[in-house]
Every structure is written in C-alpha cells, then in structure tokens.
Amino acid sequence: MRLLEKLWGQKPSRKSDKKKNGTSNYPYAVTRVRAMKSKLLPKESYPRLLNMGIDGITRFIQESEYKNDVNELAMKYSGGDLAEHALNRNLALTYDKLVRITGGELNYLVVAYLKRYDIWNIKTLLRGKIYNASAEDIMESLIAAGEFTYTSMSELAAKATYKEIIEALKYSEYYPLLQKFDGTNLAYIENELDKMYYTGLFGAIGKPRSKDRKLFLKVVRLEVDVKNLINLFRLKKAGVMQLDEIMPLMIEGGLELKPEKLATLPYDEFVNELQRTQYWDVISGVTSSDMTSLTTLESRLTRYYLESSTVLSHVSPISVAPILDYIIHKHNEATNLRIIFRGKETGLSDELIKDQLVVI
C-alpha cells in the first residue's frame, strides 16, 4: 500500500468533508469540552512544578490527565523523552476525541483548524533530515493531531533523506510547494507552509454570516496579528527594513495590524504606531530599543491571545468558540509542561523557565 494511502487510514473522519453534510451537535460537544477544560492544570500547579525535579514532575503528571500516556510509554522512555512522547500522545488523542464528538459544520471547522499539526509535522520531518537527526529523535517532536497518522509519520521519519519524504508526499496538497525545497531554503518553505495553512483555514471559514463563524474568524485573525507582530519585532531587532524582505514573511488576514505600513518604519516609529492598537497595553512595558530578548514580549502576546479566546468563547457559549478555546489552552498546557521538563533537564534556572511559561 502506498504511504499516502495510509496517511489517513486510522482517521477517516479527518478527511470527510462535513461542511454541508451531517448535523452539528453544538450543545453536546460544548458540554463535553467544558468538562475536558475543567481538567486542565490549574495555574497554582506551576509554582509547585518549578520546585520539583524531573522525577517529581513525572509523578505529578502521572496523577493527572496524562496518567495513561505516561504509563503506556514508561517502559520505553524516561526523563524528558518520556515527557515529550507522553505530551504529544495526549494531545493527539485529545484532539482526535474532539473530532469524534463533533458533527456537521462544527466538525468541519475543528478539522480545518487542526491541520496546523500537519504543517508542524512536515516542518519537523524536513528539519530533522537536514540536521541528520535520527528517526527516533524526529518522532519525539511529531504530533499525530492532524490528518497524518502516527504510523505514517513513523514511516516518513524512517526515510533516508528529505527528498524521499517529499516524494512520499507526492499526492498530497503540499507537494507542489515541497518540490521547491532544495535543502538550503528551509526558512522559506516553512513560512510558505504557514501561509498555505492560513489560506486554507480562511477558505474553510468562508465569508462568515453566522455569529459562530464570525467568532471563529476573529480568533484566527487575532492569532495572525500576534504571529506577524512577533515576527516584525524579530526583524526590527535584526535590522531588516526592506519591504521586499519583510512582506514575504507576513501572513495575510490579520485582525488589526497593517504589516505593509509597519514594515519599513524605524524601530521607534514602529513602536509609536503600535500605541494605536489593542496590543499596546499588553506590550508597552517591554518594547524598549535596548531589549536583548523577545521572550517576555512573546509571552505577553500569547497570554493576550489565550485570554481573548476565552472572552470570545463566553460571547457565544454554544458555538465553535468554546471548543477552539479549549484546543488553544490544551496546546498551551502541553507547551508549558514541555518547557519545564526541558528546562529542568538542561539545568536552566527556575527563573528562566518561569519567564518562558504562559500561565492563565
């Protein structure tokens, strides 16, 4: 059987177009998701985790919603590797559950949103091969939460070269873009994959007429703004000022920012222009021209995005918004735990680890 024929072999629901077929089951799905969100780690857990060693943190999550994942993988992995695989497994199973409990238009929107994990996995596979990582090391970072199955990704990770991976994806929608990868332009390919994802997601949302889709669109557009703003700060700090260098790195469809207007402004003027946006109160204290790290700025913007998704989920409580809010917060929890594990493993101070966390 061809690899591409197996990519969605275990997840047929991920490939079905339910945009017009089937019945959306909002009350049932939202009730289930609210129960799932109530099981996310409370913010009070994180100071405790920072005071623990790796073994203690592993025992802690083993007593939480990650219990089955840790137990399932404990015979094969240990330490940070165990945590990485357990977190990824839990994310995949959690999101797969969301696909199974949603129907109709709701399912269609959830599936479209989760395709971001296919983009993540393709990037990880290419990056791994370029840097000669082992198949095992590559698998540690893959998350089977999109349309690709764990088995198919294992086969891709086992390929000898990035060219073989691209050839295995010959019949996928990503192949025309991946053909442009020559082994030296990874940053370009990764950026184009991101833009491809958002173009597809905006296409799935369409021209929103219902309150439901308008909220969905607003959350996605806010995310695009946050991504573009972080990239603009990186480029400004790196001294990149040319419009033709900056605009190819921007994602279209943001909520408020106009990257083409901000791109060529000197740093001080760029910051002044941001004072007119909703993001200024969030970042005003961390935009000095002599700042050496963007970690705090990124954390604040991510927190704002998370908080905004929650606010919007309350605007329309029986809609896709609470489900999208849960997906976002679940991902953030896994990211926080991964940062703690890896930080402890590499000997980072608790203060440095804490600075990277986004705790709501």
From Swiss-Prot:
It comes from the Archaea. The keyword Membrane applies. Residues 1-25 are annotated as: Disordered. One of its GO terms (cellular component) is proton-transporting V-type ATPase, V0 domain. GO terms for biological process: proton motive force-driven plasma membrane ATP synthesis. Keywords: ATP synthesis, Cell membrane, Hydrogen ion transport, Ion transport, Membrane, Transport. It is a peripheral membrane protein. It is found in: Cell membrane. HAMAP family: ATP_synth_C_arch. Component of the A-type ATP synthase that produces ATP from ADP in the presence of a proton gradient across the membrane. Has multiple subunits with at least A(3), B(3), C, D, E, F, H, I and proteolipid K(x). NCBIfam families: AhaC, PRK01198.1-4. This is A-type ATP synthase subunit C. It comes from Methanosarcina barkeri (strain Fusaro / DSM 804). The gene is atpC.
